[in-house]
Amino acid sequence: MGKGKPRGLNSARKLRVHRRNNRWADQAYKARLLGTAFKSSPFGGSSHAKGIVLEKIGIESKQPNSAIRKCVRVQLIKNGKKVTAFVPNDGCLNFVDENDEVLLAGFGRRGKAKGDIPGVRFKVVKVSGVSLLALWKEKKEKPRS
């Protein structure tokens, strides 16, 4: 049988050191302490970011699906990084024009791509300060610029 953990009166230091070393195996702990959310993610740790639309693109979905998912290439204002963002709902790409200012949010699970859209980690939420959902439901109109 193994020795197990120390249980004596004077074993606190040993237990603390052991716990401190083994916490680095936890991915969430490691990411939090190393600050990777600020270093690696294009949003720099925030939930949303504004950007300028560079171009509209269609991305083919992964197998076994067959579709062209409507996306846009966006350059973020805060740091100049270029990202691809999904435009949700049927016909919403018509509301987005090049050089429009859009608000992006995360899309999918913990910074990874969602579903059958490869490499797309963000979605468009607002266009020119107006909610994309409101435009789609025809509750609001896009401001003339």
UniProtKB/Swiss-Prot annotation:
InterPro entries attached to this UniProt entry: NA-bd_OB-fold, Ribosomal_uS12, Ribosomal_uS12_euk/arc
Assembly mode: Component of the small ribosomal subunit. Mature ribosomes consist of a small (40S) and a large (60S) subunit. The 40S subunit contains about 32 different proteins and 1 molecule of RNA (18S). The 60S subunit contains 45 different proteins and 3 molecules of RNA (25S, 5.8S and 5S).
PROSITE patterns: RIBOSOMAL_S12 (PS00055)
First-listed, main subcellular location of the protein, grouped into a coarse class: cytoplasm
An annotated GO cellular component: ribosome
Top-rank taxon: Eukaryota
Record keyword Ribosomal protein present: yes
Annotated protein name in UniProt: Small ribosomal subunit protein uS12
PANTHER family: 30S RIBOSOMAL PROTEIN S12 FAMILY MEMBER
Pfam families to which the protein is assigned, alphabetical: Ribosom_S12_S23 (PF00164)
Biological role stated in the UniProt entry: Component of the ribosome, a large ribonucleoprotein complex responsible for the synthesis of proteins in the cell. The small ribosomal subunit (SSU) binds messenger RNAs (mRNAs) and translates the encoded message by selecting cognate aminoacyl-transfer RNA (tRNA) molecules. The large subunit (LSU) contains the ribosomal catalytic site termed the peptidyl transferase center (PTC), which catalyzes the formation of peptide bonds, thereby polymerizing the amino acids delivered by tRNAs into a polypeptide chain.
Record keywords: Cytoplasm, Ribonucleoprotein, Ribosomal protein
Family: Belongs to the universal ribosomal protein uS12 family.
GO MF annotation: an example: structural constituent of ribosome
One GO BP: translation
